C-alpha cells in the first residue's frame, strides 16, 4: 500500500484558510503555502472565504471581533494580491491556484459574480454555511438556533440542501465545499440523512 500511495500526487482543492485572512484559522498565508511545499504537494488551491456582502452576513467571530463588512472586503482584496504574489514567488516549487470559497444566502449570487468579475479567481469552491440567516457550523448554540428557525432538524437539512442546489445551479462551482456540512452538530445525522425528504435532495444535488 505504501508503494502505491508514494506514486500518487498530493493535491488540495480546498485548503489554505490562514489566520492572516480568516478569523477562525491560524498562521500566515505564506506559512500555509510553505507547509504544503514541505509536505510534498504537487499543487494546491488556496480558497479563503469570500468577504460578506453586509454586516448581517458575517461569521459570529467576525461580529464579535467588530470586523465590519467594508474592512473584510478590503482584506479579501488584499488576500488576492498576496496570493497572486506568492503564486509567482513559489512557482518553481508548487503550483498554486488563487481561488475562493463562496457563501450562500439571499442576494449572494450577484455579489459572488461581482467578485469574480473584479478578482478573476482561478476557480470557485461553492459552499453553504448559513441557513435562514444562521451559521450552521460555528458552534452547537448557533446550530440549535438554526434548527429552531427551520422548525425541525429535518426541515433544516432540507433547507440546507435546497440552498446548496440553488448555489450549484447559479454558480456551477468547480468544487463543492464540505457537501454534508449540515451534519456537523447532529449526533443522529445518519438517521436524519436517511429521511425521504432529505435523501431525495442529497441524490438530486449529487
Predicted regions and their residues:
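Glycine-rich, charged/polar anion/phosphate-binding loops
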Residues: 110-112, 162-163
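A charged, amphipathic alpha-helical module
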Residues: 114-116
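Domain-core and long-helix interface of multi-subunit machines
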Residues: 22, 102, 118-121, 125-206
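An N-terminally biased module of ancient metal coordination in phosphate/nucleic-acid-related enzymes
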Residues: 1-106, 111, 183-200
Amino acid at each position: 500500500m505504501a508503494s502505491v500511495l508514494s506514486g500518487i500526487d498530493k493535491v488540495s482543492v480546498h485548503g489554505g484558510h490562514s489566520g492572516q485572512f480568516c478569523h477562525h484559522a491560524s498562521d500566515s498565508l505564506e506559512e500555509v503555502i510553505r507547509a504544503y511545499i514541505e509536505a510534498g504537494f504537487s499543487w494546491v488551491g488556496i480558497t479563503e472565504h469570500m468577504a460578506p456582502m453586509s454586516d448581517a452576513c458575517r461569521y459570529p467571530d467576525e461580529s464579535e471581533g467588530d470586523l465590519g463588512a467594508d474592512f473584510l472586503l478590503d482584506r479579501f482584496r488584499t488576500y488576492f494580491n498576496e496570493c497572486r504574489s506568492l503564486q509567482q514567488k513559489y512557482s518553481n516549487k508548487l503550483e498554486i491556484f488563487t481561488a475562493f470559497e463562496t457563501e450562500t444566502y439571499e442576494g449572494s449570487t450577484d455579489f459572488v459574480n461581482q467578485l469574480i468579475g473584479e478578482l478573476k479567481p482561478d476557480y470557485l469552491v461553492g459552499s453553504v454555511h448559513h441557513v435562514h440567516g444562521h451559521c450552521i457550523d460555528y458552534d452547537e448554540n448557533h446550530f440549535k438556533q438554526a434548527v429552531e428557525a427551520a422548525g425541525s432538524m429535518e426541515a433544516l437539512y432540507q433547507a440546507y440542501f435546497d440552498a446548496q442546489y440553488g448555489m450549484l445551479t447559479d454558480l456551477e462551482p468547480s468544487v463543492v465545499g464540505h457537501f454534508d456540512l449540515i451534519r456537523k452538530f447532529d449526533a443522529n445525522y445518519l438517521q436524519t440523512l436517511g429521511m425521504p425528504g432529505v435523501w431525495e435532495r442529497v441524490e438530486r444535488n449529487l
